Amino acid sequence: MKCPFCAHPDSKVVDSRPDKGGAAIRRRRECESCAKRFTTHERIEETLPLVLKKDGRREPFDRMKIVGGILKACEKRQVSRETVDRLVDRLEGRLQEWSEKEVPSTTIGEWVMTELHDIDEVAYVRFASVYRSFKDVNEFMAELQDLLKK
């Protein structure tokens, strides 16, 4: 595995153990060139349904794209990276159980919003503001009113 510090192509595994959920392997590696250590996570590559975008394009599910969007919504909030990872793990679990070959991106977005609503309401509103593409302040205020009613 290529070293993230010096880009040397070889490293050795110094420790290997299952992660907390058992769905992945956490490995500590040491670069054979600069001797710096880094962590990698190995997980089974699942066959997930393709994501059907609003414009009709189809693309593979990208875990890091979802993580990035959620992290952006949770910026400067008391939401840990571990919480975000668990949220995305649950999302991937739902995708694995999805019975069709394609899943609309709108469905994934709604799942994320449902999860975020339970975790952090500010992160929920931030994610919704990007995901729902409010056309004006009135639409945004209507979403806030719905949130306050719940």
UniProtKB/Swiss-Prot annotation:
Zn finger intervals (unnamed): 3-34
Tree of life domain: Bacteria
Obligatory cofactor(s): Zn(2+)
Cofactor binding, note field: Binds 1 zinc ion.
Pfam families: ATP-cone (PF03477), Zn_ribbon_NrdR (PF22811)
ATP-cone domain ranges (all copies): 49-139
GO biological process: negative regulation of DNA-templated transcription
GO molecular function list: ATP binding; DNA binding; zinc ion binding
Signal peptide residues on this chain, from the entry's feature table: none
InterPro entries: ATP-cone_dom, NrdR-like_N, RNR_NrdR-like
Function: Negatively regulates transcription of bacterial ribonucleotide reductase nrd genes and operons by binding to NrdR-boxes.
Cited HAMAP family: NrdR
Protein family: Belongs to the NrdR family.
Protein name (database record): Transcriptional repressor NrdR
Organism: Geobacter metallireducens (strain ATCC 53774 / DSM 7210 / GS-15)
